[in-house]
Amino acid sequence: MTATQMRPIARLSPLVDGVRAAVEHRADWSETALLVAEELRRNLPTPEILTPQQRLGSPESYRSHTLHVEPDGTFSIVGLVWRPGQLTRIHDHITWCAFAVIQGVEHEELFDADLNLIGESDNHVGDVSGFAPPGDIHRVHNTSADTTAISVHVYGTDVTRIGGSARRYYD
């Protein structure tokens, strides 16, 4: 995966404000993920939060674009762009996460601690989910033959400081 640097995006202001309010509840990680997921539902961005160039993705791997980092480091908003066939490695996260699909379809596989497949789903435009460790081992795949998928992820950390959201890779 390749990352690009953050740029200010006024279109994200309602989402940033909503996530900030959700995080200020100081709930546990699972509850925070659900609160943030609700803010994503209420303030679902469009693909235009990314530049036309960013929306193209990369032939090498899915792309990550940091869109906002809260000044106190409590959360980051990231746009992920997946060309057809691109996927993540099986991984888990260092903190809570909420995400929404804003273009295309993302196929998600969920795994238990022994890496047994325990669930899978196709997430379409407008589908929103939130989760927190433990129990967040998954892989995401754009299974489309011809459509780029884009999703917005909110992580409970400053991803620019730590270099990403994954805690471990399993494959």
Predicted regions and their residues:
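Short acidic-glycine-tyrosine-enriched beta hairpin
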Residues: A113-H138
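A short hydrophobic beta-strand segment most commonly corresponding to one strand
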Residues: A98-A100, D146-I162
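Conserved short histidine dyad/triad with adjacent acidic residue
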Residues: V78-D92, P133-P134
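Glycine- and acidic-residue-biased ligand/ion/polar-headgroup-sensing regions
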Residues: I94-E109
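Asparagine-centered strand-capping/turn motif at beta-strand->loop junctions
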Residues: V140-S144
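N-terminal leader/capping segments at the start of a protein or of a new domain
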Residues: M1-E48
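A short glycine-rich, His/Asp/Glu-containing loop-to-beta-strand
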Residues: Q53-P84, V128
